[in-house]
């Protein structure tokens, strides 16, 4: 759970094929070192990341999911109540890019009645000489799916991703505060109208 003023959990899930670097991105974003050895995630887990926005403290729980196909039905269980969904592909692996459509459609089906921020990350940009899909094409795909887009390398430049992640957090919090303020104003207007109607009925 988060320790922010709203008292609600700010859930962020990372989705994509096995080996694209979801775990690495999460770990470097919370200050851990990049690990050169690769071990595929075999369980769902989350890592808390704290951030200050407008002098308030917020905690976002970064959920690391299992990319293997045989675990996909299990992963779907954790889509609910996600505030931010980050789809990750490996820029050197065309299959991981092509399978983004599966992940996006899967989330859209599960969260059809929920509002959330989408982002697509092209990881392993340090291997640009082996690029299997152009950055321009990937960005156009992201835009067509209503998602933010960024290429980065968890290995060589983790700050690029960390800063991008903070931008997503800030966008979510500010939009949430805006919606809450708007709802509060509507409630005040409704209450004022009720009070006026009560006063009129008493006068009669």
Model-flagged regions — what are they?
Residues 58-73:
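Switch II (G3) loop of P-loop NTPases
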Residues 62, 88, 121:
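Generic enzyme active-site microenvironment
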Residues 10, 66-67, 78, 83, ...:
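Preference for well-ordered, secondary-structure-rich cores of eukaryotic proteins
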Residues 70-74, 96, 137, 159-160:
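Short acidic active-site motifs
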Residues 31-39:
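Post-Walker A helix-loop "phosphate-sensing" segment adjacent to the P-loop in P-loop NTPases
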Residues 47-48, 72-77:
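Conserved alpha-helical scaffold flanking the Walker A/P-loop in AAA+ ATPase domains
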Residues 82-101, 111, 126-132, 155:
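Conserved Switch II/interswitch segment of TRAFAC-class P-loop GTPases
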Residues 1-23, 27-31, 50-57, 111-204:
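Conserved P-loop small GTPase signature centered on TRAFAC-class small GTPases
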